Amino acid sequence: MSQALSPAKTPKIGFVSLGCPKNLTDSELLLTQLSAEGYETSKTFEGADLVIVNTCGFIDEAVKESLDTIGEALAENGKVIVTGCLGARAGETGGNLVKEVHPSVLAVTGPHAAQEVMEVVHTHCPKPHDPFLDLVPGGFGEAGIKLTPRHYAYLKISEGCNHRCTFCIIPSMRGDLVSRPVGDVLKEAKALFEGGVKELLVISQDTSAYGVDVKYRTGFWDGKPVKTRTLELVQKLGEMAATYGAWVRLHYVYPYPSVDDIIPLMAQGLVLPYLDVPFQHSHPDVLKRMKRPASGEKNLERILRWREACPEIVIRSTFIAGFPGETEEEFQHLLDFVREAQIDRAGCFAYSDVEGAAANELPGMLPMELREERRARFMAVAEEVSTAKLQRRVGQTMQVLVDQAVGLGKKGGVGRSYADAPEIDGVVHLLPPEKFSKTYKVGDFVKARIVGTQGHDLVGVPV
């Protein structure tokens, strides 16, 4: 009597994603490929056949978190593949930093290395044989597994950066700018909208430079020519989003003159009037030491023009306080800039050495106490500006995208307006609907009248 063969155990992969949204999209790509090949994911290190850690390596805190996570995975599992930005960093002896600290990891790759990672996975954890899955063509889907909630997603349009800012080591880890074909980007965007995404967050290392590397060559989408350039891409994304009743939000936008052409699209309502612009500083001399691609005076003039063309525009930015050689006068210039530009949302880091960054060799390194003191002073001014702008929202009616619903949507909720990007900005606390028949549902848009503020957040009631 023949005995049926027991099915082979499906390999399980543990996965940890650390760092920024750009890293998150790399993780989504890997998870999509793992799923397409028949692997399952494990929620614990112990329950996995091996673990992949996608690391961040930009600042010291991120390096420590990544190394600690790798150590934890090794202790609880023993088989670990490391990928991401930290994988590209050299250690004290000139070798790979991860290998120096954790020599027992199976393999180390840099960022954006899905094929390399999959080859290591195949070596140490052969993919399951499935006669049906084996018929599926290889490659990555347009909109595979997402690590964000279903109603919003990140859309990465390029990889790498052509700038050589002295405080940054990202080009050494992620390379020069490589723009995705415009047709591929739009294809993924459509798949995301078709899948229920209500907010598309456009990301890259330098969104404004999209297409520079390919000399803005003409691509094709839906049988029609489209230039590989930020303006044309944003216009197409906005038009597409409008047909689905969705939002498009722009991140990591360097303040090039070409950005001026995008502001009218915001004024027309085609894309959200929101710009995430990494200014880093305002004083011309500091910007020169940073090797930033813009001057402080032009930045202020540009912002004022943007606000004139689109009064509703919200500007988020990040800054560095205590950069090597920064004088008190230069720092005061930065504080004045934040007030005059009326930066809606601002974050600030006290300058810290990043191994491999050119800024480490600059003269005039300031004591850490002074750097931290300036960061605190900056944040006090930034919060003054932000608080005043939030207060002016009281009485307005705003469209809010619901992120959380309490008590089946009858006891209130939490959402965001056009002025709030997920995780980095404030939220709108939604009070319970006055009519019992009304409920909040995650991923829905609601109209809310703003009745108050709460720290960095707003409070609204449905209308």
UniProtKB/Swiss-Prot annotation:
One of its GO terms (molecular function) is metal ion binding. SMART domains: Elp3. Residues 11-126 form the MTTase N-terminal domain. It catalyses: L-aspartate(89)-[ribosomal protein uS12]-hydrogen + (sulfur carrier)-SH + AH2 + 2 S-adenosyl-L-methionine = 3-methylsulfanyl-L-aspartate(89)-[ribosomal protein uS12]-hydrogen + (sulfur carrier)-H + 5'-deoxyadenosine + L-methionine + A + S-adenosyl-L-homocysteine + 2 H(+). CDD domains: Radical_SAM. Its EC number is 2.8.4.4. InterPro entries: Elp3/MiaA/NifB-like_rSAM, Methylthiotransferase, Methylthiotransferase_CS, Methylthiotransferase_N, Methylthiotransferase_N_sf, NA-bd_OB-fold, Ribosomal_uS12_MeSTrfase_RimO, rSAM. Belongs to the methylthiotransferase family. RimO subfamily. Catalyzes the methylthiolation of an aspartic acid residue of ribosomal protein uS12. This is Ribosomal protein uS12 methylthiotransferase RimO. The lineage of its organism: Bacteria, Pseudomonadati, Pseudomonadota, Betaproteobacteria, Burkholderiales. The gene is rimO.
